[in-house]
Amino acid sequence: MAVTHSVGDMLTKIRNASRVKHESVDLKMSKINKSILDILKEEGYIKNYNIFDKKGISFIKAILNYDNKRNPAINRIDAISTPGRKVYSSYKNMPRIKNGYGILIVSSSKGVITGKQAKDNKVGGELICSVW
């Protein structure tokens, strides 16, 4: 079956791998997936990621981050926008995730950025997902 929402598929794979405490997870390569992983790495939710080819198709191997007791860094990761329901927000109405402890990932005219960066740059955009 074809994947129609690559971001949603990526978020589900990360959520499932994190819950069963896998060391890493393989994801389909796309520019938006790579941008989201850049933010997750910058914020400390994943350790690193590598891009590799398998039979001519590009994939990303994301290495998940855990604490000393093997508790995942990602407690919850949820898609906000879907292909059938896009959710947009101005920088003034940008929601806070877990009272500021989580992050919001936004696709804006400045690229894929966090909700805090969107507020600081005074740009709105499509709300992709929330992580905490």
Swiss-Prot record:
InterPro entries: Ribosomal_uS8 (IPR000630), Ribosomal_uS8_CS (IPR047863), Ribosomal_uS8_sf (IPR035987)
Any Gene Ontology biological process: translation
Function noted in UniProt: One of the primary rRNA binding proteins, it binds directly to 16S rRNA central domain where it helps coordinate assembly of the platform of the 30S subunit.
The keyword Metal-binding appears for this protein: no
Assembly and interaction partners: Part of the 30S ribosomal subunit. Contacts proteins S5 and S12.
Gene behind this protein: rpsH
One Pfam family this sequence matches: Ribosomal_S8
Assigned GO CC terms: ribonucleoprotein complex; ribosome
Gene Ontology terms for molecular function: rRNA binding; structural constituent of ribosome
SUPFAM superfamilies, A to Z: Ribosomal protein S8 (SSF56047)
PANTHER family hit by this protein: 40S RIBOSOMAL PROTEIN S15A
Family note: Belongs to the universal ribosomal protein uS8 family.
Protein name: Small ribosomal subunit protein uS8
Organism expressing this protein natively: Borrelia turicatae (strain 91E135)
Record-linked NCBIfam families: PRK00136.1
Keywords, in A-Z order: Ribonucleoprotein, Ribosomal protein, RNA-binding, rRNA-binding
Keyword Ribosomal protein assigned: yes
